[in-house]
Curated annotation (Swiss-Prot):
The protein's name in its UniProt record: Small ribosomal subunit protein uS9
Organism field: Thermotoga neapolitana (strain ATCC 49049 / DSM 4359 / NBRC 107923 / NS-E)
Gene Ontology CC: one annotated term: cytosolic small ribosomal subunit
Basic residues biased stretches: 120-134
Pfam families reported in the protein's UniProt record: Ribosomal_S9
InterPro entries according to UniProt: Ribosomal_Su5_D2-typ_SF, Ribosomal_uS9, Ribosomal_uS9_bac/plastid, Ribosomal_uS9_CS, Ribsml_uS5_D2-typ_fold_subgr
GO MF term list: RNA binding; structural constituent of ribosome
Keywords assigned: Ribonucleoprotein, Ribosomal protein
Region described as Disordered: spans on this chain: 114-134
HAMAP family membership: Ribosomal_uS9_B
BP GO terms, sorted: translation
Gene: rpsI
Family the UniProt entry places it in: Belongs to the universal ribosomal protein uS9 family.
Length: 134
């Protein structure tokens, strides 16, 4: 059984987790088992799509790989960030020489910001109930 050459990267953002497989090809996109013309058909927002494929753009590898992505959790914004990190990490497996370019654009950094939990006695994480002196 011949194994298909591919590159793998995991990305996380907020509560979203993306597992990204890059395979040499002509730019086909498959997200959660469903074929798409482009990532824009999945994200439905050009800003999220641009954010997700940014690693391919800055390394001039757009159209060189077929993307197979499994993403779950979070919303579309968090998923786009997770896909972005996953693609960047997979590109590093493909070519270690891309590291300075990806690092320059801060694509190898996991965004640590998470939603702060709500505390009892408060309306939200930090918003206290209105205070009245009299």
């Amino acid at each position: 059984m011949a194994s298909v050459i591919g590159y793998y990267g995991t990305g996380r953002r907020k509560t979203a987790v993306a597992r990204v497989y890059l395979r040499p090809g002509d730019g086909k996109v498959k997200v959660n088992g469903k074929e798409y013309e482009s990532l824009n058909d999945y994200f439905k927002n050009i800003a999220w799509t641009k954010h997700a494929i940014e690693p391919l753009e800055v390394t001039n590898t757009i159209g060189k790989f077929d993307l197979v992505i499994r993403v779950n959790g979070g919303g579309l914004s968090g998923q786009a960030g997770a896909v972005r990190l996953g693609i960047a990490r997979a590109l590093l497996q493909y070519d270690e020489n891309l590291k300075p370019v990806l690092k320059k654009y801060k694509m190898l950094t996991r965004d640590p910001r998470e939603v702060e939990r709500k505390k009892y006695g408060l309306k939200k994480a930090r918003r206290a109930p209105q205070f009245s002196k009299r």
